[in-house]
Regions:
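C-terminal outer-membrane beta-barrel translocator/porin domains of Gram-negative envelope proteins
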Residues: 2-221, 226, 231-235, 239-242, ...
Length: 247
């Protein structure tokens, strides 16, 4: 919570609405990191500490994200990548490019662990080397097309779709394998990790999800000398689908 300051502020505001135990608070009446805030969240989620339904949903959402971001994950898998580019050389201004990546993780590990009857965690998921391994299918596709318009201008189009589906030993996708939105190479109206998921209000500094759709189109042109300009539109977002997380 020292890093996720927005999440801390949200929980801290909620705690100030109630008769929170003084042992959870510092001299400024703020939740102590990590002991105070962890204890407060634990009691709210387990319903030992009564709050409104709206506050409970907010705390429960932040707790799910905390567990997802801080949990240890063992990822054993393989991937296949394909790329097809029509560009002949660096001076070719009219070209297209298609990329495809498929990643499958945890299947062989799951088969082996079931045969060996390995230990399980508190949720009944198999563990290997003391860690719950991830099992998922992830695909990414991207397409780029450039069209020259005259000598010093062109139109550039890019689209991307990605989805990661957990199954078997997993209910969600590890943070390192999830998608994010925003930033200078994505949806430029938002800072990196600040957009989504879905229509949520971005309670966290690092918002991620397991499905992403992005598209942008640009008109690039020469202004003067080495000074170039561009007019662009960006579309897209991230969403949580087929997992245990709701937007």
């Amino acid at each position: 919570f020292n890093i996720y300051s927005n999440s801390f502020k949200s929980v801290n505001i909620i705690s100030n609405r109630y008769n929170t135990p003084s042992s959870y608070l510092d001299i400024n009446n703020n939740l102590i990191i990590p002991s105070g805030i962890d204890s407060f969240i634990s009691e709210v989620v387990s319903k030992q500490f009564a709050v409104s339904n709206e506050d409970f949903n907010s705390i429960n959402y932040l707790n799910d994200r905390k567990n997802r971001l801080t949990s240890n994950n063992l990822i054993i898998g393989s991937s296949f990548s394909f790329s097809n580019k029509s560009r002949k050389n660096m001076y070719d201004n009219e070209f297209s490019e298609f990329k495809l990546k498929i990643e499958l993780a945890g299947n062989l590990t799951n088969l082996t662990s079931n045969l060996l009857n390995v230990s399980k965690d508190e949720f009944g998921k198999n563990k290997v080397l003391g860690l719950t391994y991830s099992q998922f299918l992830k695909t990414e596709t991207g397409y780029i097309k450039h069209w020259p318009i005259g000598l010093n201008s062109k139109i550039a189009f890019r689209t991307f779709f990605g989805i990661a589906i957990p199954f078997g030993n997993s209910n969600s996708i590890p943070f390192s394998k999830s998608f994010f939105a925003g930033g200078s190479n994505d949806n430029r109206a938002w800072e990196v990790y600040r957009l989504g998921p879905g229509s949520s209000e971005a309670l966290s500094e690092f918002n991620e999800a397991n499905m992403k759709l992005a598209m942008n189109i640009e008109y690039r042109f020469k202004i003067l000398g080495k000074l170039d300009g561009a007019v662009f539109s960006d579309f897209g977002n991230i969403w949580n689908v087929f997992d245990n997380t709701e937007d």
